[in-house]
Design a protein with these regions (language model features):
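Short amphipathic alpha-helix that is part of the acyltransferase structural core
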Residues: 1-40, 47-50, 148-150, 154-156
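Conserved beta-strand in the GNAT
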Residues: 47, 53-61, 66-74
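Conserved acetyl-CoA-binding loop-helix of GNAT-fold acetyltransferases
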Residues: 75, 81-96
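Conserved GNAT acetyl-CoA-binding A-motif
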Residues: 96-111
Length: 156
């Protein structure tokens, strides 16, 4: 079982782990940003709100290896390029680093976002240096010619 991240208050922003009853609100947010995403019951879904409105969301999906996969980081179009994603992901990674049971967090970054993830502490990784389940997803993405970059926030 993974450590659960607490609620954070960051100036006027609030980052929370979304409970199962509120997942539909995050699904609606993703839809409003033209993301075709449906949050699963077992996903750790986090949102960042401002003035009571969701302005960013991300999912941490547990893998067989016990590590997490960061998926579907999304910021409302009107709030982009203002450090919102940095606030959200930064708080999640900080909590993971200090969790009772630390785990690594991996993601598949679009090429133009590589430097963003590097600035948060992610490193570009080769498939042979990650757990098998993470590498399998990477190889499927490569087969689909998605061009995503395998990255990891390595704690352990």
């Amino acid at each position: 079982m993974h450590a659960e991240l607490p609620i954070f208050d960051v100036e006027n922003f609030t980052v929370v782990r979304v409970n199962e009853l509120r997942l539909r609100l995050v699904n609606r947010f993703y839809s409003s940003c033209n993301y075709n995403v449906k949050c699963g019951r077992l996903d750790q879904v986090y949102s960042l709100s401002y003035g009571g409105e969701i302005i960013a969301a991300a999912r941490l999906v547990s893998q067989k290896s016990g590590h997490l996969l960061l998926r579907n980081l999304c910021v409302a179009p009107a709030m982009r390029n203002q450090g919102v994603a940095t606030q959200l992901v930064g708080k999640l990674l900080n909590a993971l680093a200090f969790a009772e049971i630390p785990v690594n967090c991996y993601c598949y970054a679009l090429p133009h976002l590589k430097n963003f993830y590097v600035s948060l502490g992610f490193k570009h990784l080769l498939p042979e240096h990650v757990p098998e389940d993470i590498a399998e997803i990477h190889f499927r993405n490569c087969a689909r010619k998605r061009g995503w970059i395998l990255m990891g926030f390595i704690i352990i």
